[in-house]
């Protein structure tokens, strides 16, 4: 049996946490031969800690062969101690009458503290995925608050947008998602992100050629993917939790186990590719191998695409400047 991997999950008793933990413990994220120790963080309030205890009781009752241990805590330094993987799911949701900038600042406080705790106690090669929104900027804040860790250790989740786009293309083409490759999603995990199928193929044939409908792309596909989260809240009365948890599992599994040359989308600190300023946490097409991701380079960006990329970048820059004063 392999040595256990330590996985931290914040917001562990929340909706996404509940949809996530059982799948991690069953081996869906890191492999069916990889034991895990779950290190679970919840808010230091009685109700949250009681809920966390209940979730841990359920995890015990599953008797997962791969679950080698569990810790439940309200202290980030306990939750992040020696972790190999950290899923930062917990964030402050937007309350009634709350402006986006208030939301940014409330979350900046959380992710500054979590970045500092990771910096202090996590493994030096920890893989961090920020799921809690605004995910890109929260990941940027955590990264900036962990000066001793490699910035490449920090990522934001755009896999939900990627998977949503895959599913829309599959429905449009009447072809299974499994055959679709080379899809890209650029930018922020927000309605400004740009799902781009110009390079994508279904069973090896160009999707752009098969659809050949720029009107559908601009007025149906892009807005449907961008506003899917809102559509789910409208229908379900709750935000997408199971699909977000599924995307988090996909993101970490691919980062750790590799994509065998296939493109996936990750929010990563820019290296200057495609004119995105260095350090901006931006969605790019990537491939992964041996626990490292590589941005897919030198794709042609046409005027239509550039307009969308500029728009999502402008939003990220605005978010970044809104929290700059907190990061020194």
Curated annotation (Swiss-Prot):
One of its GO terms (molecular function) is L-malate dehydrogenase (NAD+) activity. HAMAP family: Malate_dehydrog_2 (MF_01517). Its EC number is 1.1.1.37. CDD domains: MDH_chloroplast-like. The active site is at residue 189. GO terms for biological process: malate metabolic process; tricarboxylic acid cycle. This is Malate dehydrogenase. It comes from Xanthomonas axonopodis pv. citri (strain 306). Keywords: NAD, Oxidoreductase, Tricarboxylic acid cycle. Substrate binds at residues 94, 100, 133, 164. It catalyses: (S)-malate + NAD(+) = oxaloacetate + NADH + H(+). Transmembrane segments: none annotated. NCBIfam families: MalateDH-SF1, PRK05442.1. NAD(+) binds at residues 11-17, 107, 114, 131-133. Catalyzes the reversible oxidation of malate to oxaloacetate. Belongs to the LDH/MDH superfamily. MDH type 2 family. The keyword Cell membrane does not apply.
């Amino acid at each position: 049996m392999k040595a256990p991997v330590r996985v931290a999950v914040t917001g562990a008793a929340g909706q996404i946490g509940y949809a996530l933990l059982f799948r991690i413990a069953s081996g869906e994220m890191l492999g069916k031969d990889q034991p895990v120790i779950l290190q679970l963080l919840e808010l230091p309030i009685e109700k949250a800690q009681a809920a966390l205890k209940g979730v841990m009781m359920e995890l015990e009752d599953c008797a997962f062969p791969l679950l080698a241990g569990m810790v439940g805590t309200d202290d980030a330094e306990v939750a992040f101690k020696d972790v190999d993987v950290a899923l930062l799911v917990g964030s402050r949701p937007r309350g009634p009458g709350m402006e986006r900038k208030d939301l940014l600042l409330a979350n900046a406080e959380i992710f500054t503290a979590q970045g500092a705790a990771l910096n202090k106690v996590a493994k030096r090669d920890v893989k961090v995925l920020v799921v809690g929104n605004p995910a890109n900027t929260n990941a940027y804040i955590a990264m900036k608050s962990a000066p001793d860790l490699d910035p490449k250790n920090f990522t934001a989740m755009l896999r939900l947008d990627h998977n949503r786009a895959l599913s829309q293309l599959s429905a449009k083409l009447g072809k299974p998602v499994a055959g679709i490759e080379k899809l890209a999603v650029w930018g922020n995990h927000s309605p400004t992100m740009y799902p781009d199928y110009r390079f994508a193929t279904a069973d090896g044939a160009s999707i752009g050629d098969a659809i050949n409908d720029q009107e559908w792309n601009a007025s149906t596909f892009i807005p449907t993917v961008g506003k899917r989260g809102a559509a789910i809240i409208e229908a379900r009365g709750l935000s997408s939790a199971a699909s977000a948890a599924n995307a988090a599992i996909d993101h970490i599994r691919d980062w750790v186990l590799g994509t065998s040359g296939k493109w996936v989308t990750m929010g990563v600190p820019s290296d200057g590719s495609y004119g995105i300023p260095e350090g901006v946490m931006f969605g790019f097409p990537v491939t992964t191998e041996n626990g490292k991701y590589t941005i897919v380079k030198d794709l042609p960006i046409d005027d239509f695409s550039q307009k969308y990329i500029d728009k999502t970048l402008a939003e990220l820059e605005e978010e970044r400047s809104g929290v700059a004063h907190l990061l020194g």
